[in-house]
């Protein structure tokens, strides 16, 4: 996986990340992917359609960002900090059908956007570990 602890700042938040909600009939995973596509200027790609056509989230991110999408399953919240610190939010699955977008961190808190309620939330490292443990620590990220 992509992680270098020595090269990770202690505090970081991805720029230009406003709250967002799921659209009509849109999954939280598709909403998170579409928010990343908007951030990367690839709004012409619809994540819901791509997922329905059998593409994985990592494949969608690879095609849309000009970088490389990664399935970071098994990483810890601490390990995804490296990816976030490179101005790329990370999708975290809280369950098989509930995705959130992790956009920042400090030593004491993680910041994430939940498209299910349209709100910004924070969680301590222990809370974040608990939130993602139910999905088996499923994270999806990308590098540019």
Annotate the PLM regions.
Residues 1-25, 29-144:
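Conserved active-site-adjacent core of cysteine acyl-enzyme catalytic domains
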